[in-house]
Amino acid sequence: MKHMLQICCKNNNISKEFPIGSSLLDIYYGFNLNFPYQVVSAKVNNRSEGLNFRVYNNKDVEFLDIRDSSGMRTYVRSLCFILYKAVSELFPEGKLFVEHPVSKGYFCNLRIGRSIELEDVTAIKKRMQEIIAENIPYHRVECHTTEAVRIFSERGMNDKVKLLETSGSLYTYYYTLGDTVDYYYGNLLPSTGFIWLFDIVKYYDGLLLRIPNKENPNVLEEVVKQEKMLDVFKEHLRWNYIMGLGNVGDFNMACEEGHATDLINVAEALQEKKIAQIADDIYHRGENGNRVKLVLIS
């Protein structure tokens, strides 16, 4: 006789028995729930987990689709992994940085040693669609952090190396998609076939990864031009460069080496300089007859 466990589904307040070690995806199918959109993740005792997560004790489970913020993050992370895999295959020497949520999508900086052409974007999108059609499973791997550092170091992923070296964790989870390896702080979908809608377009000097609308996931978010917001993000990156901070690992290392106060002082100096520039701009506009009545600083 199989050992069973009790699962209480919060979506319909029904409890059922399942074999110990059942995955959340198996449990979802067992409850025969009727969602208007694809279920992408679940909350197990109010903690977000991927659908490949296996349950070994009695739990409360609530399944989530893309309309939930946690579900949307799972979808976007999984989509970013597909984008990374496509780019790494098409441009082995290139570097991809998913930088900012802007224009109701995600701005991506792709460095391939030249300007990005429309043909490049078309090739990336085509390869992403092929990866989705292949329905490749995402695998989560647990290993000793020193082993994970070695794996990412061999692949030249120095930002991941610094992050893991300063995480303070003895063991680390990373993900594989075919022969592609990456690190994500959060859950991914069971396989690439769970992605049903996306777009990738040229956007200023980079790419814009478009995602489904949260309220109506059957359509993409409308692109809203946000030049000023993009400029603010880019200025923030320049400030980080001045402070020697390219990623979270750099920040962690700076703090470990006792430079936290220096970082704060430099950041405050940059902010004071920016405020002075705003004051100069207000003054010069007044000289030209364009009196400023209201200034909003976020």
Predicted regions and their residues:
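Ubiquitin-like/PB1-type beta-grasp interaction modules and other compact soluble beta-rich domains
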Residues: 1-80, 84-85, 91-102, 113, ...
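Auxiliary tRNA-acceptor-end handling modules of aminoacyl-tRNA synthetases
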Residues: 53-72, 95-103, 107-291, 296
